[in-house]
Amino acid sequence: GADLIGNSGNLPLQGRDKVLAGVILDMALSSTIASSLDLGHSVLGQLSDVTALHQKRVEQAGFAVLKSPDIPSILVETGFISNRGDCRRLMDEHHRQRLAEAIFAGVQGYFRQRPPAGSYLAALSAQPPG
């Protein structure tokens, strides 16, 4: 976590003791990793209706671009261009559209269930039905 103090997102770490800042950052990252896994499960569930999955579970990796301490992040693999069947499907516009719609549905479903505070979705979910 200490390597990310320069990339603390919206966390209030400026002027804090370095040890305290590291603890706050580690706590935020742990929460964000859990949220990222939930988001990944939501997207993977939608993709399983569209294409064969290489892995039927969400995997974790330490990609630097996926380490924002305050934003759930996922990397979606939709196929391998080195695989002829995958490559053929990825060249098909209809298949790409279905993949995009599945990814969108997974992201949308995740955020509808867990709307970020102060967001449009949070405001919608706070309104009484009717």
Language model: regions and residue ranges:
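Active-site-proximal helix/loop segments of hydrolytic enzymes
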Residues: 1-130
